[in-house]
């Protein structure tokens, strides 16, 4: 296991600085997910750890040791990519064994490691098969097993599930969580998919344009976002954010109470009209026109219908406020927080 630190790291391509003066600590033994849209800098950070995309300035540390300029082969890491990068002419066993042979690991130890990690990834019965005869998920497991037999201090994973179909992605997600729980190794996982990040991470690092927007556990990043960007990136559907003078008002779709009358005591209450209805089994998602704004509501109540008039209510504890720059306004930040709640109900019509 290992702790990774970025200290005042900058990465530039020519005159374009994609990451500037970044500080980040990735905790030892945690499953950390770097998440953000394409081009936000998450893979650039991963490549710096791997040593295949060195920092322009600043330092990358592993357990306090400066590895900024260390040869990638000496970093005690293993990397799994979006593409499987396995040898189609070799059997599963030969693929897993390949790196061990190159490192001149004795045969007896190789056999032991292959047996151990083939069992971890569920490939024991497929060791003599060629990759072409296996499913996409099984091929990705070969790549995982080949990384695991190295017993690295750090696993780096760059969107390893993005080539799999939706059902298989969910299954592999669970398997990766179980693998991390068994191995207790530092996992650093890159994805653009916030659902993957929320489902898998001990710690999420949300990035945008080379900057860290928030670093926190899934629970904190969802319930206590620092800014409007985080609030709307994390969550499906994303948080509804409405103008409120110079400031902004937000609330999660699932915290809206739908009905035919205003919820007693709710400071926010507006009339709306259902534009669309998506029944998803345990919950139903509604798109609702509310004055000049269209918002999303997620409810366990599937009795509301398309084209129906409804009343939307939100309790005070479920309201979020942001300033004109999108930064969160919390009760402890201002002395007049209750005035924000009153302002939230300024346009009530229900």
What are these regions (language model features)?
Residues 43-46, 142:
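ABC ATPase nucleotide-binding domain helices that frame the ATP-binding cleft
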Residues 35-37:
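The feature captures the beta-strand-to-loop junction immediately N-terminal to the Walker
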Residues 5, 25, 61, 311-313:
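ABC ATPase nucleotide-binding domain
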Residues 72-226:
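ABC ATPase nucleotide-binding domains
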Residues 237, 248-350:
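Non-catalytic connector elements of ABC transporters
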Residues 4, 19-21:
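Conserved structural motif at the start of ABC-family nucleotide-binding domains
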Residues 58-66:
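Conserved ABC transporter NBD signature motif
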Residues 50:
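Helix-to-loop junction immediately C-terminal to a conserved catalytic motif
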């Amino acid at each position: 296991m290992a702790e990774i630190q970025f200290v005042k790291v900058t990465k530039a391509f020519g005159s374009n600085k994609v990451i500037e003066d970044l500080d980040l600590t990735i905790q030892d033994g945690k499953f950390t997910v770097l998440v953000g849209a394409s081009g936000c800098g998450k893979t650039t950070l991963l490549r710096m750890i791997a040593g295949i995309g060195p920092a322009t300035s600043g330092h990358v540390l592993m357990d306090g040791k400066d590895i900024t300029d260390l040869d990638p082969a000496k970093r005690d890491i293993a990397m799994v990519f979006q593409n499987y990068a396995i040898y189609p002419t070799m059997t599963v066993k030969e693929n897993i064994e390949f790196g061990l042979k190159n490192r001149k690991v004795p045969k007896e130890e190789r056999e032991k490691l292959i047996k151990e990690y083939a069992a971890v990834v569920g490939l024991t019965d497929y060791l003599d098969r060629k990759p072409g005869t296996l499913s996409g998920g099984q091929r990705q497991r070969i790549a995982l097993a080949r990384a695991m037999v190295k017993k690295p201090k750090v696993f780096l994973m760059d969107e390893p599930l993005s080539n799999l179909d939706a059902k298989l992605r969910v299954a592999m997600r669970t398997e990766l969580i179980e693998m991390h729980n068994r191995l207790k190794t530092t996992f650093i996982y890159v994805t653009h998919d916030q659902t993957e990040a929320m489902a898998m991470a001990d710690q999420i690092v949300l990035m945008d344009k080379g900057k860290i927007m928030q670093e926190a556990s899934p629970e904190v990043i969802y319930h206590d976002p620092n800014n409007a960007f985080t609030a709307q990136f994390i969550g499906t559907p994303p948080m509804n954010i409405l103008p409120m003078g110079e400031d902004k008002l937000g609330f999660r779709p699932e915290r809206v109470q739908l009905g035919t009358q205003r919820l007693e005591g709710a400071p926010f209450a507006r009339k709306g009209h259902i534009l669309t209805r998506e029944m998803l089994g345990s919950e139903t998602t509604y798109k609702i026109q509310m004055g000049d704004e269209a918002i999303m509501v997620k409810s366990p109540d599937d009795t509301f219908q398309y084209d129906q008039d409804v009343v939307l209510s939100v309790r005070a504890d479920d309201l979020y406020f942001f300033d004109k720059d999108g930064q969160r306004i919390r009760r402890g930040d201002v002395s007049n927080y209750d005035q924000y709640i009153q302002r939230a109900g300024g346009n009530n019509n229900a």
